[in-house]
């Protein structure tokens, strides 16, 4: 069979072809233009065969064959021909074309192989060869190969060429060798705009934004080089990371005047810069005026709204992308998931993640971090475990977050398990990391997990481990804030002061605002409201949390007037008053017996402050009225609530019924609580105590039997006291302490002394059906009394004894402490589950409102 090749005839119309027979006996007239008409590999090969069979393959035709093989993508045949081609300028052009073609196809290693082959065959590269080779070295981050090519460029003299120098700077940058990139740049004899772009990009991408802007300043001010659109794309990200929006605005103006603003990449960088500077209105203006947008444009807007807390706008934009069927990438989905998660909408974040998976987009490390944050926010443990399993099943590095930061995914897993109250699982993951693998975030999330959801003592133990010599990580501001939460929980004033001192020593500037807020909260909850006020007064900047924290502290300590003074000052300065602030005001009034003021603030909430009262506000007002004995008014308030009263309101009412011994009203409140939350342990305990105080022991037995039947467990009461050597905890009748004998003897002696001056045991608080003598013995062994005796034994003369109880202080113990403060040389500061009691010289700061 005769095989013919059809090649388009340039001289004829486009549909006419020249026929070339494979077995023709006469030599065809094959010219360079004829060869270049070949469009397929088979056509070029057939021409090649004809030239070989007739022996007419000249160097000129070989050169054109090589060029055509490259153009049709048959690079291997081009290399074969070039190996036998004698060195020449035309041949160097072909080597360059081959190296570039392999580079364009992502075959960097093949580029370097060809470069080595070229050199071994005694070919001399030119100023076009080196940029292609340097680009290949950069793509595979091979500094060694790059240095070899660099040396050859020095030998051949091409290093002085500006294009070669620019490519060399870019290569060292891609290999993360900034010092070499800067050295090459400084040694260049001439710089063009590409040179400046290369060095600015190097600093910008390798985490040196400040130096990048300094180089840009030199480029424009010192050397007068006019920026192009690539310059803007390289300079705007450093502006974003440093928050230098003033320079960003200048670049924006330059982009407008130089007509670069229509460049999509410049527009994207401007949107990103404004978004990261929190200037979303400006970002939206640029975004809206962009004639061409891609997914990067939308991503910058969605991420920007999420970062500044405008989650509704972020979600709205994400939904608009879905409506307009814009193809979203993993960055878009991750930003949307983050927006939902940071709003506390964890289940919505999980829903978006499912949509992402169903659309065929695989999550990356950033996505997992956002989803796990959403799970943590709503306590979705099972979903969190599913994400954990996904991360293990698919090739996702738990120790990377996609931006080079170590441990971000595993840190988020630890945080998720801790916030879902699986602190042991979180600790197991923490322990699975070697000491060298743990970064400061790892320590912080574990300490935070113990502080808020586990064991505050273990949180402080972990903090202590961070200060050991072999630990390479030191606490940062976030670690300190988590540790202060633990101190506040334990009322560990001594340790809190040590942490405060560490923060002052190790902060380069002022203590961060959020740490100062935690210090105010810690000192207030540790019973030192004067130290809390001192921190407040020394703060350079304050926010709503600062003022509210101090106001809460005053309320806890019964200083209602001072709390309202803080509130009035907040109003004068112009802070926005929200529901939380007004709740603290009502709380302070309740714990100070300020009934009229509390009622006035409650009645003015909506009309003056624009805040609708919620269930918590009603509960606080019920507590205010109930503590004052106005139980009928409190009940009317509950019945007139515009919403269904939740358990918290009825519990407040029941607590007041117990204080005033109103059994029937207490039973009514308990019934309401049972209807709404049948396993609420506090309501059963309050009702049982109410019956006990009324001497209705059969009802006490019935309630306790009901609690056992429903599996409701009463928390055991315990008290702890802070001493020189640490914190010591006592339970009722506790005799496990090594110095129990001395503790009981001190207590016995002091109880006898206060009886001599008028103290009479209030046996109604002994919640057991026994005779009065046994009740006296039961009251004697209460945990807060044992803690006080230990404090008397161990506290230096004149220093305050600080006691914390996990439940409400017993009425008899409160009376006993009042008498004790008359006969001992110590102030007694007692914190119970409700408030602080400062006992001094026979009186208590609560004034009976507890």
Swiss-Prot record:
Gene3D superfamilies: Tetratricopeptide repeat domain. It comes from the Eukaryota. PPR repeats lie at residues 58-88, 91-125, 126-160, 161-191, 192-227, 228-262, 263-293, 294-328, 329-363, 364-398, 406-436, 439-473, 476-510, 512-542, 543-577, 578-608, 614-644. Keywords: Repeat. SUPFAM superfamilies: TPR-like. GO terms for molecular function: RNA binding; zinc ion binding. Residues 756-850 are annotated as: Type DYW motif. Residues 725-755 are annotated as: Type E(+) motif. Residues 649-724 are annotated as: Type E motif. One of its GO terms (biological process) is RNA modification. Belongs to the PPR family. PCMP-H subfamily. This is Pentatricopeptide repeat-containing protein At5g16860. The gene is PCMP-H92.
């Amino acid at each position: 069979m005769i095989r013919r090749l059809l090649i388009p005839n340039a001289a004829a119309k486009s549909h006419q072809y020249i026929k070339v027979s494979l077995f023709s006996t006469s030599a065809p007239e094959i010219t360079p233009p004829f060869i270049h008409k070949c469009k397929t590999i088979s056509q070029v090969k057939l021409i090649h065969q004809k030239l070989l069979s007739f022996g007419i393959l000249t160097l000129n035709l070989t050169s054109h064959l090589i060029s055509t093989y490259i153009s049709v993508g048959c690079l291997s045949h081009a290399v074969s021909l070039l190996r036998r081609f004698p060195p020449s300028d035309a041949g160097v052009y072909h080597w360059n074309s081959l190296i570039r073609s392999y580079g364009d196809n992502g075959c960097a290693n093949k580029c370097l192989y060809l470069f080595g082959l070229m050199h071994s065959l005694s070919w001399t590269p030119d100023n076009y060869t080196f940029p292609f080779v340097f680009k290949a070295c950069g793509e595979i981050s091979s500094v060694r190969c790059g240095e070899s090519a660099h040396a050859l460029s020095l030998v051949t003299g091409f290093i002085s060429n500006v294009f070669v120098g620019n490519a060399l700077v870019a290569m060292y940058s891609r290999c993360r060798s900034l010092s070499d990139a800067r050295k090459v740049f400084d040694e260049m004899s001439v710089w063009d705009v590409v040179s400046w772009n290369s060095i600015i990009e190097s600093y910008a991408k390798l985490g040196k934004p400040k130096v990048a802007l300094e180089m840009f300043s030199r480029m424009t001010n010192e050397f007068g080089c006019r920026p192009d659109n690539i310059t803007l794309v390289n300079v705007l990200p450093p502006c974003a990371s440093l928050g230098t929006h003033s320079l960003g605005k200048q670049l924006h103006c330059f982009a407008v005047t130089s007509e670069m603003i229509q460049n999509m990449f410049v527009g994207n960088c401007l949107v990103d810069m404004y978004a990261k500077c929190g200037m979303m209105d400006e970002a939206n203006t640029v975004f809206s005026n962009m004639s061409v947008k891609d997914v990067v444009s939308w991503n910058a807007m969605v991420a920007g709204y999420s970062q500044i807390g405008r989650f509704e706008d972020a979600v709205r934009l994400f939904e608009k992308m879905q409506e307009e069927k814009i193809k979203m990438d993993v960055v878009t989905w991750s930003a949307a998931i983050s927006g939902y998660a940071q709003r506390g909408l964890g289940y919505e974040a999980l829903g978006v993640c499912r949509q992402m998976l169903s659309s065929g987009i695989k999550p990356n490390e950033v996505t997992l971090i956002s989803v796990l944050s959403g799970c943590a926010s709503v306590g979705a443990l099972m979903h969190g475990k599913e994400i954990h399993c996904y991360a293990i099943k698919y090739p996702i590095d738990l120790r990377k977050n996609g931006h080079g930061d170590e441990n971000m995914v595993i840190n988020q897993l630890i945080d998720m398990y801790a916030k879902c109250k699986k602190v042991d699982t979180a600790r197991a993951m923490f322990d699975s990391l070697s000491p060298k693998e743990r970064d400061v975030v790892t320590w912080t999330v574990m300490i935070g997990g113990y502080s808020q959801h586990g064991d505050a003592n273990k949180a402080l133990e972990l903090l202590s481990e961070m200060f050991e010599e072999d630990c390479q990580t030191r606490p940062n501001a976030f670690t300190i804030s988590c540790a202060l939460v633990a101190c506040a929980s334990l009322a560990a004033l001594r340790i809190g002061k040590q942490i405060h001192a560490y923060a002052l020593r190790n902060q380069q500037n002022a203590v961060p605002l959020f740490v100062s807020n935690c210090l105010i909260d810690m000192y207030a909850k540790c019973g030192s409201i004067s130290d809390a006020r001192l921190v407040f007064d020394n703060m350079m900047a304050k926010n709503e949390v600062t003022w509210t924290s101090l106001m809460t502290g005053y309320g806890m300590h019964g200083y209602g007037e001072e709390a309202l003074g803080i509130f009035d000052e907040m109003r004068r300065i112009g802070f926005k008053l929200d529901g939380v602030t007004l709740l603290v005001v009502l709380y302070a009034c309740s714990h100070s017996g300020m009934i009229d003021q509390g009622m006035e603030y409650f009645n003015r909430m909506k009309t003056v402050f624009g805040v609708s009262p919620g269930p918590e506000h009603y509960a606080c007002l019920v507590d205010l009225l109930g503590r004052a004995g106005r139980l009928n008014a409190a009940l009317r308030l509950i019945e007139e609530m515009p919403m269904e009263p939740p358990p918290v309101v009825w519990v407040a009412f029941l607590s007041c019924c117990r204080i005033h011994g109103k059994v029937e009203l207490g039973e009514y409140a308990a019934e309401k609580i049972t209807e709404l939350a049948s396993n609420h342990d506090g309501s059963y305990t309050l009702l049982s105590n109410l019956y006990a105080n009324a001497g209705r022991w059969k009802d006490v037995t019935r309630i306790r039997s009901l609690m056992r039947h429903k599996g409701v467990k009463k928390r055991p009461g315990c008290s702890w006291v802070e001493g020189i050597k640490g914190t010591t905890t006592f339970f009722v009748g506790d005799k496990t302490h090594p110095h129990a004998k001395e503790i009981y003897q001190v207590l016995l002696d002091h109880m006898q002394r206060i009886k001599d001056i008028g103290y009479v045991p209030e046996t109604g608080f002994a919640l057991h059906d026994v005779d009065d003598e046994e009740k006296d013995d039961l009251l004697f062994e209460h945990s807060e009394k044992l803690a006080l005796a230990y404090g008397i034994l161990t506290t230096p003369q004149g220093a305050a004894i600080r006691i914390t109880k996990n439940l409400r202080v017993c009425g008899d113990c409160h009376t006993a402490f009042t008498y004790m403060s008359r006969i001992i040389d110590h102030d007694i500061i007692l914190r119970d589950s409700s408030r602080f009691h400062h006992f001094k010289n026979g009186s208590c700061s609560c004034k009976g409102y507890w």
